């Protein structure tokens, strides 16, 4: 029996395959780009998260019977808004914190509420 851990970070998705005993069998990391459209802003394409996660899982599980994977857990960076269209597809890049358009609006609140 195997378990998969997936960490969607701001620079890469990191994946771990382990046995039920806790023995680590494989570790994979798949990078994706980070965009800086304006000073202080950072964005990523949610499609890159998905594509690299799927590629990473394929690579991670090479050589095992995938039917033996009993569970998968996901974790990721916080505060990344993904906006979807009517068909549930991302239609913009995801703004990341720190450094996003929202930080311009949040600054006055920081001053008003110490």
Label the predicted regions.
Residues 1-93, 106:
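N-terminal glycine/serine-rich phosphate-binding loop of ATP-dependent small-molecule kinases
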Residues 98-114:
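Glycine-rich phosphate-binding loop plus the immediately following alpha-helix
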């Amino acid at each position: 029996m195997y378990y998969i851990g997936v960490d969607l970070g701001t620079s890469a998705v990191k994946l771990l395959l382990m046995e039920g005993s806790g023995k680590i069998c494989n570790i994979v990391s798949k990078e994706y780009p980070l965009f800086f459209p304006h000073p202080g802003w950072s964005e990523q394409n949610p499609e890159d998260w998905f594509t690299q996660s799927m590629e990473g899982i394929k690579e991670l599980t090479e050589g095992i019977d995938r039917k033996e994977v009993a569970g998968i857990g996901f974790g990721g960076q916080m505060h990344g808004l993904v906006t979807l269209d009517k068909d549930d597809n991302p239609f913009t890049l995801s703004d990341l914190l720190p450094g996003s358009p929202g930080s311009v609006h949040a600054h006055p609140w920081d001053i008003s509420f110490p």
